Amino acid sequence: MPTNLPALPMDTTPELLLAARVRDQLKADKQALFADFDLSSHVGTLVTRLRRAVDAALAEAWRGLDMPADAALVAVGGYGRGELFPYSDVDVLLLLRAEPDADTVSRLERFIGMCWDLGLEIGSSVRTVEDCIREARADITIQTSLLEARLLTGNRKLFEALRTQHQADLDPAAFFQAKLLEMRQRHAKYQDTPYALEPNCKESPGGLRDLQVILWMTKAAGLGDSWKELFERGLLTQREAQELSRNERLLKTIRARLHLVAGRRQDVLVFDLQTALAESFGYRQNANKRASEQLMRRYFWAAKAVTQLNSVLLLNIEALLFPSESQVTRVINERFVERQGMLEITSDSLYEDDPHAILETFLLYERTPGIKGLSPRTLRGLYNARTVMDARWRSDPENRRLFLAILQEPQGITHALRLMNQTSVLGRYLINFRRIVGQMQHDLFHVYTVDQHILMVVRNMRRFAIVEHTHEFPFCSQLMASFDKPWVLSVAALFHDIAKGRGGDHSKLGTVDARRFCKQHGIGREDADLICWLVEHHLTMSHVAQKQDLTDPDVVHAFARVVGDERHLTALYLLTVADVRGTSPKVWNAWKGKLLEDLYRITLRVLGGARVDPHSIWAQRQEETISQLRLKAFDPELGKPLWAQLDVAFFLRHDSRDIAWLTRHLFNKVDSPVPVVKARISPAGEGLQVAVYVKDQPDLFARICGYFERKAFSIQDAKIHTTRHGYALDTFQVTDPGLADDGGNYRDILALVEHELGDRLQQQAALPEPSQGRLSRQSRSFPIKPRVDLRPDERGQYYLLSLSANDRTGLLYAITRVLAKHRVSVHTARINTLGERVEDVFLVDGSRLAADNRLQIQLEQDLLAALEI
């Protein structure tokens, strides 16, 4: 039998009149309900009354069309559950006793047509009882839908027959396993986190679906289908039932308001709607937080609580459905045992009787081999011990000893801290950490809430110390292996962003928090000083590496003075790599890794007493390049004509591998009449390195950037050099977001880039207008005010041009086109893309700018205009 029928147009006057009357009544009912909800915010009333209004409309349509007496109209899915959100689908089952004849098919088609005419998003199926049972056995979704079936109108006996057969056919244990697998797959789809910046309030972990899964499981097992019933059956405490009801109400309210704000079915809290949604709740922007941040923090707290209680309930239901034949326990101490790999408390009142056991739980979790999680009894005990975790508990010397011991364990720190955060213990011990739980970061490059970012940084730091992960960042792993106290770095990571969102400099405020923590926990002076220094300077190395000229000895010496010694340098380098990697998968790339490693190595040389003045670097670079050339069986003497045209600055700004590569390809093209373009897989490990050698010409840099824009390449770095005889020798690090990172696909386009770019540079056509690239949704929702800063360097020879704006396609070309228009030459370009935000730094020729103040003003104005869209 076909399960879906087409909606046929109604062609009789009585049916048209019926549809018009029912439609008008339903529309009026909806408008009244939406208006009442806007005033009262009682979501339970809204979804129930909206369901009743649709019930009445469907029943009247069913009766008005004189549907068969042996058929039934059944609500299924969420609609069957008895609640309907403003723009949700209305799922119905047209239940028949037998295969329909032609007349019945015609009636059913007219009914479906009327449903659509009523303005309902109808989802319909036509089945007999036997069809339903057969398909439910094959499809867990249909089985779940029938679990919530509710008779709307029609033949009650037929409906009862369906319900009886479905219940008899239902295997609670198999249903539990199927729904658990389905939930895990759904969680994986949403990255297994409730903290996505654009969560789905229905489907994401911690969303409404997680609550529904529990009630489906318990209903299938005959344990109840409401939080009140689960409390009465002993599966929940009264407090847990109240907490679940409260969070369910909030999530439903968010979903209902989201539908109304969007004017359509919308379950994802997209950036575009977060502000309007927050304002519908009455939130307003304050000095430190946007309205959307305040609402989203409330959402994340609710989702976190749902996730926590969901874990407890799932384990409890599993224990009831799958009782273990052997309850073998291993005694750990008088307070804890291991049961089937789970750490379990020996008394329900343990935490109230002995609050020290709260932190001992996580220390044992780290130290005890074979423990893979916390039992339902332990999770419930922690949840119900929240009132014990007060100021007195936080200041207890034994608890401070235990917490520091957790951080000092050689393994298991990441898992322990994540578990402490999931159970809210971490935020109750570190009150300032609690303040950043669920706090969003609208800086366009962090994709995690602050607490999740901090734990991600701790995780990245710990992976440097784990043998199985040494292949990921070998240099970092090498440094970590020789670092005397890795736990110090974990403490610094825990505090580096803890003061976000308070207003003021979070690095300095976080340093105060870290100093207090070190004093309270008896951390020695030397280690405490390092921790606090790391928190205060956790952004310094990234700033220097990505925004300053690392070939400038003054820059390196200044940075070396800040770090002071090798221990501070190594600690800051490891924290910086872990921090940048913990912001977003899009922010870290191999080129940034190379910049940070280069800064580390050259600073280490300075700290070791090595000279980094221009002459010594130039001499060393030439020696290294000659060695590189000989390794390639290339006679260094052949490169002398090219080197004669290169000044000291060139050797300072390029490493020996790059100089050797350029020498081998340009030694016989020193006076080439045509552009020479060479490309190779970047030595940094990602993307391409492209070299351009051509007689210098106006607009050259803009022309090259225009080519890369057209090819959708992202420029990471550019070094621009003019030889003594008037040739431009420019090198670029570029990536293509559409290509894989293994180099294979890049290798396929090397010749294409060389040919196309060389041809473009020969054409000498006028610079085309930059494309008006579109901003992403996130950038449109959280725009950055464009900023341009132009200032001379200390010598006055060059100007440093810094720009920040929302990223978009063609932005770099638009910038370089403005520079070309004003005949301002670029010497270096450091292109720093942070997610949806760009922070670019250019070193430009200062000769014309220094002589003409009006040119500076006009240049800044034109650049600001180019950054706007």
Curated annotation (Swiss-Prot):
Enzymatic reactions: [protein-PII]-L-tyrosine + UTP = [protein-PII]-uridylyl-L-tyrosine + diphosphate; [protein-PII]-uridylyl-L-tyrosine + H2O = [protein-PII]-L-tyrosine + UMP + H(+)
Gene3D superfamilies: 3.30.70.260, Hypothetical protein af1432, Nucleotidyltransferases domain 2
One Pfam family linked to the record: GlnD_UR_UTase
Alphabetical UniProt keywords: Hydrolase, Magnesium, Multifunctional enzyme, Nucleotidyltransferase, Repeat, Transferase
Organism superkingdom: Bacteria
Annotated ACT domain residues: 689-773, 800-869
Cofactor(s) the protein needs: Mg(2+)
Molecular function (Gene Ontology), one example: phosphoric diester hydrolase activity
One annotated GO biological process: regulation of nitrogen utilization
Domain HD: residue ranges: 450-572
Region (Uridylyltransferase) location: 1-331
Record-linked InterPro entries: ACT-like_dom_sf (IPR045865), ACT_dom (IPR002912), HD/PDEase_dom (IPR003607), HD_domain (IPR006674), NT_sf (IPR043519), PII_UdlTrfase/GS_AdlTrfase (IPR013546), Polymerase_NTP_transf_dom (IPR002934), UTase/UR (IPR010043)
Record comment: activity regulation: Uridylyltransferase (UTase) activity is inhibited by glutamine, while glutamine activates uridylyl-removing (UR) activity.
Assigned EC number: 2.7.7.59, 3.1.4.-
Uridylyl-removing: annotated segments: 332-688
Function of the molecule: Modifies, by uridylylation and deuridylylation, the PII regulatory proteins (GlnB and homologs), in response to the nitrogen status of the cell that GlnD senses through the glutamine level. Under low glutamine levels, catalyzes the conversion of the PII proteins and UTP to PII-UMP and PPi, while under higher glutamine levels, GlnD hydrolyzes PII-UMP to PII and UMP (deuridylylation). Thus, controls uridylylation state and activity of the PII proteins, and plays an important role in the regulation of nitrogen assimilation and metabolism.
Matches recorded under PANTHER family: BIFUNCTIONAL URIDYLYLTRANSFERASE/URIDYLYL-REMOVING ENZYME, BIFUNCTIONAL URIDYLYLTRANSFERASE_URIDYLYL-REMOVING ENZYME
Comment, domains: Has four distinct domains: an N-terminal nucleotidyltransferase (NT) domain responsible for UTase activity, a central HD domain that encodes UR activity, and two C-terminal ACT domains that seem to have a role in glutamine sensing.
Family: Belongs to the GlnD family.
Identification of the protein by name: Bifunctional uridylyltransferase/uridylyl-removing enzyme
